[in-house]
Amino acid sequence: MINQSFQETNRFSMNSRLQWLIVIACITMVFAACSKTDTYKSDQLSEYMPLQKGKYWIYLLDSTNFYNSQRVQTQYQLKDVVDDTLKDNLNRTTYRVIRYIRPSSSTSDSAWNIMGEYYLIPTTQTLETIDFFNFKYQSLKLPVVLNLTWKGNSYLPAFPYSEALPVQSSYNFTVDGGMGDWDYTYTGVGENDTINGIAYTNVVTVSQEDASTNLLPDNQTPTSVNDFATRAYSAEKYAKNIGLIYKKLELWEHQPASPTNPGGYYVGFGIQLQLIDHN
């Protein structure tokens, strides 16, 4: 009886030790998995946005504006010139970029008129952009790898274009709500692309938003004049050793038909930039 009891106790003890060994092994595996650091081979952000005083980019700008039910498109040329470097309030090197505008058909340097200025701030992990309205974006982020996602608009106010701007510059819509939650994603890395007939290599695509409400598959036409419809689209492309080569932003609403506007009406804007020259 004593031997049998001893054997059962010993067997129980061995089973308990085995269970604890399994638990400890599992915990060790979990901690090992948690402590593992993935490493990515990535280009530097400076390769996709080379910045130095005197650097310039010239773009073809297609601008869309709405007048009641009419969609009006106009075309210009923009020239962005890195004008100077300064320090921001965090003592970070900041590049001031002056933007000029002229008619799309012009080739005269005297036709350029200053439109405004914006700022580019390269940090150790991101490229920050502060635009004409003092809105800040994280335009690029390390590592530059496919499907990396980040909240590039996280610094924006809740309704940047409808509430944060001065009344004379604001839009009476709500489609800008939630822009701070947009997911910037690298949907293309190291690709070939053609913009306005010019071929580029090593192109990075940053998809920012692509959302529609009550639109036909063309994403431009409401399903009915009686429907409230929205369009929010944003994307950028950068070419290695060149910079921004393409940008598109659509932000607009269609309001349903009414006695005063039987076709409904639109509120909002759209822009498209395509690089045509640079140094």
Regions found by a protein language model. Give the residues of each.
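Alpha-helical transmembrane segments
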Residues: 25-28
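C-terminal motif of bacterial Sec signal peptides marking the signal peptidase cleavage site
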Residues: 30-33
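Conserved functional acidic sites
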Residues: 35-279
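Bacterial N-terminal signal peptides that target proteins for export
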Residues: 3-22
